[in-house]
């Protein structure tokens, strides 16, 4: 019995040694699910001779009878073919169309006294549920492979990111830059096959935007999409958080159907206007400090879980002059690195601070500029003209007092004049009345120099 053990070991070693020789010459071909593959078989004689293709179960797939193509009873019957034009050259190909994972097998070509074996491994790579995904969602790629295989997969995204894995690859938090063609390579037995998958990330072109406006100017908000779909249906809403308000509120709601926009509800203050076609476009009639703040536009697409988001910010500037103070202010979300300045035209800045309000006391006459800038780049500018003032601050008040006194004196003088004139007329009227009475009574008046001849009674 002890002598039998070494013999069995020797037999096993011989089998292992002979195994590579039995499989020597077997070619490995990788195919893609749904594609077409050509398995080659070349005869030593460059002429048309009889050949047969069989599977590992020795079931005939196809062959020839002279110049005619014959097919066997295999499950591939309606999906196989051969290039007859190459038979005369001793090339007898097996063409398998619309490959399936279950087509993975060892195919045997018998031509003349030759026998060739080709191992076909069919792989499939598919994306989870849909290739149209919302920004921020996860992408999962699943590899279908034949039993017994142990492939590795490496994918490269459009933005150049490499992902490696086995039969499942996952990418979380998709970004807009991930939209495009993904190239995935499957490796098996030192052979490789390449897949290309088109992924569309549904998103706005910009995650956020900021609009700078002077007080009173018209404001335009635009929300262009980063993708194109023939039939786009959904609904959206713009919520706004004003800087001066304690809570946010809905400014407008709308529906989207076949790229046409219809407004469902809009606030009266402010009363936004919305374009009727894509891209989504909103108009605010006037930029006012009470509207400065941040908004969030959401778009829910039909048959999609989740929403698209775009943040929009409004910064409003106001330049005012009140008595001796020239003020420049901004409202809305601004970066701490932004600089606010007040300067006289063509001169150096009088004041420049990283704050939301600056001012100048007793400003010189001329055109003043209120500037909001970032690293020297002017983002917003508002001009205000300061008129010349009096040399001393007392004179305007003195003129007002003097004017008031002069007006009062003139009023009193006119009153006295009219009063004296009225009194004089009344006295003159009394005298005339007295003269008439005396004349009617034939009495002399009290004026002897005029009526002395008629002073005595008749």
Curated annotation (Swiss-Prot):
GO MF assignments:
coreceptor activity; interleukin-16 binding; interleukin-16 receptor activity; MHC class II protein binding; MHC class II protein complex binding; protein homodimerization activity; protein tyrosine kinase binding; zinc ion binding
Q: Which residues lie on this side of the membrane: Cytoplasmic?
A: 419-458
State the compartments where it is located: Cell membrane
Q: Which residues are glycosylated?
A: 296, 325
Give the way it sits in the membrane: Single-pass type I membrane protein
Instruction: Kindly list the biological process annotations in GO that this record carries.
Output: adaptive immune response; calcium-mediated signaling; cell adhesion; cellular response to granulocyte macrophage colony-stimulating factor stimulus; defense response to Gram-negative bacterium; helper T cell enhancement of adaptive immune response; interleukin-15-mediated signaling pathway; macrophage differentiation
Record bears the keyword DNA-binding: no
List membrane-spanning regions: 397-418
Quote the residue positions with lipidation, kind S-palmitoyl cysteine: 419, 422
Q: Start and end of every Ig-like C2-type domain? A: 126-203, 204-317, 318-374
Which InterPro entries does this chain map to? CD4, CD4-extracel, Ig-like_dom, Ig-like_dom_sf, Ig-like_fold, Ig_C2-set, Ig_sub, Ig_sub2
What cystine linkages occur within this chain?
A: 41-109, 155-184, 328-370
Domain Ig-like V-type: from-to ranges? 26-125
Pfam family membership, one: C2-set
Which residues are the signal sequence here? 1-25
Entry keywords, A to Z = Adaptive immunity, Cell membrane, Disulfide bond, Glycoprotein, Immunity, Immunoglobulin domain, Lipoprotein, Membrane, Palmitate, Phosphoprotein, Repeat, Signal, Transmembrane, Transmembrane helix
Modification sites for Phosphoserine = 433, 440, 456
Q: List the ranges whose topology is Extracellular.
A: 26-396
Q: How is it modified after translation?
A: Palmitoylation and association with LCK contribute to the enrichment of CD4 in lipid rafts. Phosphorylated by PKC; phosphorylation plays an important role for CD4 internalization.
Q: Subunit info? A: Forms disulfide-linked homodimers at the cell surface. Interacts with LCK. Interacts with PTK2/FAK1. Binds to P4HB/PDI. Interacts with IL16; this interaction induces a CD4-dependent signaling in lymphocytes. Interacts (via Ig-like V-type domain) with MHCII alpha chain (via alpha-2 domain) and beta chain (via beta-2 domain); this interaction increases the affinity of TCR for peptide-MHCII. CD4 oligomerization via Ig-like C2-type 2 and 3 domains appears to be required for stable binding to MHCII and adhesion between T cells and APCs.
Instruction: Quote the record's domain comment.
Output: The Ig-like V-type domain mediates the interaction with MHCII.
What does the record give as the function of this protein? Answer: Integral membrane glycoprotein that plays an essential role in the immune response and serves multiple functions in responses against both external and internal offenses. In T-cells, functions primarily as a coreceptor for MHC class II molecule:peptide complex. The antigens presented by class II peptides are derived from extracellular proteins while class I peptides are derived from cytosolic proteins. Interacts simultaneously with the T-cell receptor (TCR) and the MHC class II presented by antigen presenting cells (APCs).
- PANTHER family per record: T-CELL SURFACE GLYCOPROTEIN CD4
> Protein name, please?
T-cell surface glycoprotein CD4
Gene source species: Pan troglodytes
């Amino acid at each position: 019995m002890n002598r039998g053990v070494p013999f069995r070991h020797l037999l096993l070693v011989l089998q292992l040694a002979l195994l590579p020789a039995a499989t020597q010459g077997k070619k490995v071909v990788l195919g893609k699910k749904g594609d077409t593959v050509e398995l080659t078989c070349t005869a030593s004689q460059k002429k048309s001779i009889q050949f047969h293709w069989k599977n590992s179960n020795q079931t005939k797939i196809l062959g020839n009878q002279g110049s005619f193509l014959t097919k066997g009873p295999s499950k591939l019957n309606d999906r196989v073919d051969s290039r007859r034009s190459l038979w005369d050259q001793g090339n007898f190909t097996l063409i398998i169309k619309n490959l399936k994972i279950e087509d993975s097998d060892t195919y045997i070509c018998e031509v003349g006294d030759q026998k060739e074996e080709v191992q076909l491994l069919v792989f499939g790579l598919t994306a989870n549920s849909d290739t149209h995904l919302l920004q921020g969602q996860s992408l999962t790629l699943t590899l279908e492979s034949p039993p017994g295989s142990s492939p590795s997969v490496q994918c490269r995204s459009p933005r150049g990111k490499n992902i490696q894995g086995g039969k499942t690859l996952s990418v979380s938090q998709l970004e807009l830059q991930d939209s495009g063609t993904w190239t995935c390579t499957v490796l098996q037995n030192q052979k490789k096959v390449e897949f290309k998958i088109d992924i569309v990330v549904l998103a706005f072109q910009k995650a956020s935007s900021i609009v700078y406006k002077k007080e009173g100017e018209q404001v335009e908000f635009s929300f262009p999409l980063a993708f194109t779909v023939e039939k786009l249906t959904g609904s959206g809403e713009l919520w706004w958080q004003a800087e001066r308000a304690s809570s946010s509120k809905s400014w407008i709601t709308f529906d989207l159907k076949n790229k046409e926009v219809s407004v469902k509800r809009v606030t009266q203050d402010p009363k936004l206007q919305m374009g009727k076609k894509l891209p989504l476009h909103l108009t605010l009639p006037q930029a006012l400090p009470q509207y400065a703040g941040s908004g969030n536009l959401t778009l829910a697409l039909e048959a999609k879980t989740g929403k698209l988001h775009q943040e929009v910010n409004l910064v409003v500037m106001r330049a005012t002059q009140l008595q001796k103070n020239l003020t420049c202010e901004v409202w809305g979300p601004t970066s701490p690195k932004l600089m606010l300045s007040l300067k006289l035209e063509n001169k150096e800045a009088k004041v420049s601070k990283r704050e939301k309000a600056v001012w100048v006391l007793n400003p010189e006459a001329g055109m003043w500029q209120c500037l909001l800038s970032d690293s020297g780049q002017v983002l917003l500018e508002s001009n205000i003209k300061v008129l010349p003032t009096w040399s001393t601050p007392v004179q305007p008040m003195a003129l007002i007092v003097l004017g008031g006194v002069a007006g009062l004196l003139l009023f009193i003088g006119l009153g006295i004049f009219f009063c004296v004139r009225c009194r004089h007329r009344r006295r003159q009227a009394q005298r005339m009345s007295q003269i008439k009475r005396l004349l009617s009574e034939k009495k002399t008046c009290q004026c002897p120099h005029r009526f002395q001849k008629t002073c005595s009674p008749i």
